[in-house]
C-alpha cells in the first residue's frame, strides 16, 4: 500500500505530502507525535524532529486557545522545503477528549483532557475538500480512543493521493467551504474596501476567534480575486531573509546593484532578435555574482553557497539554501521595472554608453515590452523573457495578479511564535489572520485590522482611509451586490449554489470589476473612467508591484473588455442615500449620529405608545362613565314619579 502513494525515488506522487499528528505535551508544549511519511527522510514515524523551514508547524496545527473549543479547523501556509517548489498548504482538524475516556492512557498524559490535531500537508490549495475528508477521519481517529492506532492515518494518506491524484484546480471544488454570500451578508459594502486594500498590497490583519471563522473569512476575500486561490498563492509564504541582524535597521526595500545581476555581453544580445525570446545562451556566474555584505531580495547565488544557512536562522519563515531553478525563476520574474532601470544606469557607468542599450526601454520598439535576463541556477544559463512575468499560471487577462510574490505574505493563521514576521524588514506586506489579542494590540505593525466579528475595518492612516473611500460608482456596485444577496438569503433552494446572488455570481461580478479597471488603465484620456474607481486609488495602485508586473506585458483579450466602470452614471437622489448610509456606518461621527437617531426614534415610538394608551384610556373611561350615568338616569326616572292611586293623575 505504501508504494501506491509514492514514486520510486520516495517522493509523493500525489498532492498530499504528509499526514501529521500534533499533540500537546504538559512539559514540552505542542509537538509532532506522528508523521507519515516521516517529515525528515530516514526518521521514524514517531520522530519529533522538524525541518527548520517548518518549525512553526506544531503551533499552527494546534492554535492558541484550542482548549476553549471542543473542535476546530485551521488553514495555514508553510514555505517549501529547501527553497524548492511552491507553498505547502496545511489543513488541520483538532479535537479534545477527556483522558478518562481513553482505552489506552499513556504515561505522559497527566491532564484531564487530551488535545490532538490531525493535519494534511498538500501541494494543492483544496482547503474545503481536504477539510471535509479530514474531519471525518479525525472523528474516527478519536473514536478509537487509542492514539497508537495509526493505521487509519496511513490509509488516509493513500486514499487522498489516489482519489486526488488527477485533481484539477479548475471548477467549484477549489472554492468548497468559501462562501462570498456569507461574506457580503456580513461585511456588506465593506467587501469592496477589503478588495481594494489587498490590491494596494497593504499590511492587513484579520482578527476573530475561533480559527475556522478567521481562515474562512480571509480565504473567502481572496477567492474574489480571479485565479488567486487556484494559482496565485504558490509564492505567498516565501521571502528572502537578511544575513545579519544589523541589516534590519536599513530601509525596507533597496534596489539591488548591477553587480547583483547576471548580464549578457552586448554582442550576443545584438545578434538576438526580440522575437527569439526563448533562446538560451550560456553564461558563467561564479563567486563574483554573490554580494559580500548583503543578501538582497533577489540574488543569483553561486555554487559556493550550497548547503549554507543564515546565521540567524531562528527568526525566519524560510531558510533557503542555494536556490533551485524554480526559486531562482520566481525571484527574477517578480522584479519591477525600476530595478532594471537602476541596473542599466550602473552598467552605463561601468561598461560605457555603447553597452547600455540592453536594458534601456528607449532602444526597444515602442510596441515591445522590456526585456529581462532570467538566470537558471542549475545549468548556468539565462533565458531572455519579454516583459516581467509573475511566475504564476495566468489566464488571457493576466490573472491572477502577482500580489503574493516578492515578500508579500499570505498567512491565513499566524501563531504567536511568528509575531516577528510582522516587523521583519524583508516582508513587504501581508494578509494574515490571528486569534491572539496581542496581534490586535500592536496596531503599528499593520495598516489595517479587520475585526471579523463586528465587520469592522480599522484603517490607521487617515490618508489611506481617504484613498479607499468608495466612489459613487463603487457604492452602486456594492449596493447591487448586497441587494441581490439579501433578496435571496431566505431561499432554501439557493443555498449559495444558484446563479444570481449566489457564490459564483458574486465572484463573476468582481471579475468584471477588476477586468474593467485594468482595461481602463490602458486607455488614453482615461481620467473620467478612472475617476469612477477613485483617481487617487488608481494612482497608488499603479505604484504597486502587482500592477507593474501586469502592465509590463500585453493582454490582447482586454481589448474586448468595456473599460468603463460597471456602474458609471449620473449622480441621483438614490446616490445621496447611499452616500449618507455609507457615512453613517463608517465614520465615528456618523455612528454617533446614527446611534442618537435610533435612540430618539425608539423613545418617540415608546412615548407615542404611552400617550396613545393614556389618551385612549381616559377617553374610554369618560365614555364608560357617561354611559353609566345615562343608564342610571333612564332607569331611575319611573321610580321618582310613582303612579297616583286609582289610576288618575
UniProtKB/Swiss-Prot annotation:
Ranges that cross the membrane: 204-229
Domain of life: Eukaryota
Major localization listed first in the record, in broad terms: other
Modified residues (Omega-N-methylarginine): 589
Biased composition (Polar residues): 301-311, 352-377
Residue span(s) of domain uDENN: 17-161
Annotated compartments: Recycling endosome; Membrane
Keywords assigned: Endosome, Membrane, Methylation, Phosphoprotein, Transmembrane, Transmembrane helix
Topology in membrane: Single-pass membrane protein
One GO CC term on file: recycling endosome
Record-annotated dDENN domain positions: 343-594
Domain called cDENN: residue spans: 173-341
Family affiliation: Belongs to the AVL9 family.
Function: Functions in cell migration.
Full protein name: Late secretory pathway protein AVL9 homolog
Organism name: Mus musculus
Amino acid at each position: 500500500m505504501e508504494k501506491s502513494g509514492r514514486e520510486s525515488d520516495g517522493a509523493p506522487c500525489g498532492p498530499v505530502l504528509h499526514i501529521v499528528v500534533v499533540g500537546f505535551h504538559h512539559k514540552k508544549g505542542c509537538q509532532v507525535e506522528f508523521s507519515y511519511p516521516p517529515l525528515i527522510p530516514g526518521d521514524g514515524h514517531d520522530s519529533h524532529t522538524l525541518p527548520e523551514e517548518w518549525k512553526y508547524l506544531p503551533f499552527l496545527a494546534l492554535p492558541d486557545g484550542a482548549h476553549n473549543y471542543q473542535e476546530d479547523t485551521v488553514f495555514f501556509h508553510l514555505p517549501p522545503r529547501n527553497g524548492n517548489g511552491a507553498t505547502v498548504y496545511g489543513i488541520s482538524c483538532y479535537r479534545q477528549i477527556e483522558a478518562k475516556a481513553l482505552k489506552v492512557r499513556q504515561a505522559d498524559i497527566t491532564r484531564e483532557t487530551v488535545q490532538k490535531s490531525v493535519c494534511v500537508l498538500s501541494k494543492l490549495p483544496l482547503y474545503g475538500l481536504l477539510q471535509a475528508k479530514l474531519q471525518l477521519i479525525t472523528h474516527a481517529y478519536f473514536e478509537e480512543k487509542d492514539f497508537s492506532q495509526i493505521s487509519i492515518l496511513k490509509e488516509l494518506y493513500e486514499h487522498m493521493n489516489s482519489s486526488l491524484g488527477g485533481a484539477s484546480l479548475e471548477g467549484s471544488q477549489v472554492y468548497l467551504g468559501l462562501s462570498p454570500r456569507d461574506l457580503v451578508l456580513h461585511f456588506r459594502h465593506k467587501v469592496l474596501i477589503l478588495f481594494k486594500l489587498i490590491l494596494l498590497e497593504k499590511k492587513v490583519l484579520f482578527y476573530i476567534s475561533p480559527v475556522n471563522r478567521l481562515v474562512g473569512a480571509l480565504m473567502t476575500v481572496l477567492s474574489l480575486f480571479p485565479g488567486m486561490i487556484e494559482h496565485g498563492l504558490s509564492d505567498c509564504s516565501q521571502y528572502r531573509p537578511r544575513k545579519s541582524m544589523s541589516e534590519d535597521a536599513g530601509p525596507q526595500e533597496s534596489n539591488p546593484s548591477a553587480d547583483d545581476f547576471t548580464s549578457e555581453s552586448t554582442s550576443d544580445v545584438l545578434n538576438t532578435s526580440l522575437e527569439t525570446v526563448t533562446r538560451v545562451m550560456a553564461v558563467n556566474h561564479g563567486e563574483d555574482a554573490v554580494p559580500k555584505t548583503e543578501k538582497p531580495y533577489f540574488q543569483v547565488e553561486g555554487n559556493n553557497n550550497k548547503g549554507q544557512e543564515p546565521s540567524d536562522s531562528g527568526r525566519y519563515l524560510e531558510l533557503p539554501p542555494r536556490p533551485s531553478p524554480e526559486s531562482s525563476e520566481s525571484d527574477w520574474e517578480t522584479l519591477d521595472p525600476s530595478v532594471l532601470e537602476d541596473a542599466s544606469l550602473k552598467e552605463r557607468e561601468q561598461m560605457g554608453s555603447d553597452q547600455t542599450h540592453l536594458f534601456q526601454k528607449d532602444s526597444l520598439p515602442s510596441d515591445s515590452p522590456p526585456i529581462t535576463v532570467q538566470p537558471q541556477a542549475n545549468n548556468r544559463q539565462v533565458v531572455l523573457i519579454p516583459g516581467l512575468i509573475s511566475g504564476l499560471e495566468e489566464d488571457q487577462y493576466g490573472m491572477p495578479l502577482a500580489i503574493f510574490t516578492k515578500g508579500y505574505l499570505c498567512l491565513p493563521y499566524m501563531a504567536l511564535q511568528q509575531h516577528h514576521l510582522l516587523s521583519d524588514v524583508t516582508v513587504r506586506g501581508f494578509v494574515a489572520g490571528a486569534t491572539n489579542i496581542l496581534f490586535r494590540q500592536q496596531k503599528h505593525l499593520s495598516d489595517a485590522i479587520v475585526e471579523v466579528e463586528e465587520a469592522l475595518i480599522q484603517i490607521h492612516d487617515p490618508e489611506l482611509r481617504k484613498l479607499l473611500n468608495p466612489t459613487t460608482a463603487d457604492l452602486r456596485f456594492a449596493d447591487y451586490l448586497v441587494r441581490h444577496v439579501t433578496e435571496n438569503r431566505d431561499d432554501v433552494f439557493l443555498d449559495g449554489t444558484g446563479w444570481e446572488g449566489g457564490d459564483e455570481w458574486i465572484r463573476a461580478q468582481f471579475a468584471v470589476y477588476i477586468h474593467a479597471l485594468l482595461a481602463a488603465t490602458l486607455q488614453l484620456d482615461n481620467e473620467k473612467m478612472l475617476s469612477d474607481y477613485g483617481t487617487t486609488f488608481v494612482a497608488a495602485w499603479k505604484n504597486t508591484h502587482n500592477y507593474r508586473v501586469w502592465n509590463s506585458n500585453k493582454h490582447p483579450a482586454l481589448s474586448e473588455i468595456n473599460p468603463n466602470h460597471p456602474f458609471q452614471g449620473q449622480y441621483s437622489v438614490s446616490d445621496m442615500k447611499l452616500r449618507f448610509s455609507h457615512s453613517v456606518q463608517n465614520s465615528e461621527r456618523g455612528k454617533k449620529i446614527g446611534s442618537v437617531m435610533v435612540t430618539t426614534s425608539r423613545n418617540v415610538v415608546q412615548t407615542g405608545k404611552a400617550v396613545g394608551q393614556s389618551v385612549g384610556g381616559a377617553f374610554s373611561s369618560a365614555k364608560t362613565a357617561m354611559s353609566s350615568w345615562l343608564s342610571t338616569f333612564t332607569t331611575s326616572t319611573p321610580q321618582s314619579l310613582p303612579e297616583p292611586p286609582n289610576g288618575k293623575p
